[in-house]
């Protein structure tokens, strides 16, 4: 069982690469405790012996998205040295995700706790998050979790999932029907999903020998995707040449940025490019500016989404990350302070809040943003900064 109320789960927050002033550390530490308690106590549901479904919230949408679940699992893995239950919960989720979940045609938009498909729509990024969660577990635990029934190991499962990705043979880009906001894609290739594809290929390459995969082929995939991002997504922007939100790979593109597209903001954290990369910098400066149609103006304004009006905490998290990496510590501090001001006493964050007043507008229980912020506070995803390349 998770620790009871009032019992701290985490030690003092470790030094990090993101801007975190000393005066905000105690409040952020409290949010970490609350988010960790919510995942362990409310969203990581035991559905069978040795199996857990991680749902997006415990009241309104008792459904599982592989995307939301990944960021919650990332918090557990980031806290695994401090929380004795964390590794076991993630292992049980991986067993549910790869075993019980109905994956006919891939993971769909959302699944019920019994593994059945709830919303039948294919999102390319949600085929990649289960692979990353498995790789993250291997890194944190030093060993692979027990494979699902009927499988001697993980190699065949991973290889089959990787081969099934709808990657265009000419472009090297992966396509999806919907974007991470659960809205129909205007163009087939989404920037944040290609960043995620590069990251997954890079991570798989490092463990190719253990999984029986071809390291050279994975390196080639990563190189192709990185080159395609620079070649196929470039477009003019108010801060210089930037990357488009989505493209058809053959000349058409859309300039926009959404609070749901964390991988774009995380690109330097994962090592795709250094923070001083001009195209990434211009992309994120546009994302965090009123020139972006996804921006929500107001006293409490910030990055939002066409999916639901208002300022999104997921957008505030992107602002904290991007402005920290860009060296704008004053703006990074304001973004973090806004997140902590909006957070409930239990550490949870809503899906969206009013840009004029800060009042919550949607989803009072939403594990994804609080889990992501807490994982970042514990040092998740920062190792790639040391190996980032501008190539």
Please give the residue ranges for each predicted region:
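Long, well-ordered core segments of solenoidal/helical folds
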Residues: 31-48, 85-107, 139, 152-173, ...
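C-terminal capping/lid segments that line or modulate ligand- or cofactor-binding pockets
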Residues: 119-137, 254-274, 311-391
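Extended ligand-binding clefts on enzyme/binding-domain cores
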Residues: 66, 156, 169, 173, ...
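Well-ordered alpha-helical scaffold segments within catalytic/enzyme domains
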Residues: 15-24, 70-84, 129-147, 195-211, ...
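Aromatic-rich carbohydrate-recognition surfaces in CAZymes
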Residues: 62-169, 194, 364-381
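Acidic/His metal-coordination segments adjacent to aromatic residues that form catalytic metal sites
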Residues: 48-58, 106-122, 171-189, 249, ...
């Amino acid at each position: 069982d998770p620790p009871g109320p009032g019992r701290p789960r985490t030690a003092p927050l470790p030094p990090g690469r993101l801007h975190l002033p000393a005066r905000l550390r105690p409040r952020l530490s409290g949010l970490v405790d609350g988010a960790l308690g919510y995942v362990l106590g409310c969203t990581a549901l035991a559905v069978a012996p040795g199996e857990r479904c991680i749902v997006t919230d415990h009241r309104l949408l008792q459904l599982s998205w592989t995307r939301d679940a990944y960021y919650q699992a990332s918090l557990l893995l980031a806290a695994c040295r401090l929380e004795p239950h964390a590794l076991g919960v993630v292992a049980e989720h991986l067993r549910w995700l790869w075993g019980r979940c109905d994956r006919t045609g891939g993971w769909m938009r959302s699944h019920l706790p019994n593994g059945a498909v709830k919303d039948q729509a294919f999102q390319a990024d949600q085929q990649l998050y289960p692979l990353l969660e498995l790789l993250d577990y291997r890194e944190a635990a030093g060993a692979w979790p027990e494979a699902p029934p009927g499988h001697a190991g993980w190699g065949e499962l991973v290889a089959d999932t990787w081969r099934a990705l709808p990657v265009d043979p000419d472009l090297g880009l992966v396509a999806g029907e919907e974007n991470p906001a659960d809205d129909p894609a205007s163009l087939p290739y989404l920037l944040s999903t290609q960043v995620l594809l590069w990251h997954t290929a890079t991570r798989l390459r490092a463990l190719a020998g253990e999984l029986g995969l071809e390291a050279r082929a994975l390196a080639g995939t990563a190189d192709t995707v990185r080159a395609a991002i620079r070649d196929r997504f470039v477009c003019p922007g108010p801060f210089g040449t930037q990357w488009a939100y989505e493209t058809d790979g053959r000349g058409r593109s859309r300039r926009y940025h959404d609070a749901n597209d964390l991988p774009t903001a995380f690109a330097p954290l994962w090592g795709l490019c250094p923070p001083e990369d001009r195209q990434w910098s211009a992309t994120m400066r546009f994302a965090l500016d009123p020139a972006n149609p996804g921006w929500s103006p107001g006293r409490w304004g910030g990055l939002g989404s066409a999916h639901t009006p208002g300022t999104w905490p997921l957008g505030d998290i992107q602002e904290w990350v991007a402005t920290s990496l860009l060296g704008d510590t004053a703006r990074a501090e304001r973004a973090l302070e806004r997140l902590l001001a909006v957070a409930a006493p239990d550490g949870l964050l809503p899906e969206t809040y009013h840009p004029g007043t800060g009042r919550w507008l949607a989803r009072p229980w939403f594990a994804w943003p609080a889990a992501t912020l807490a994982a970042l506070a514990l040092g998740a995803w920062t190792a790639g900064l040391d190996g980032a390349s501008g190539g």
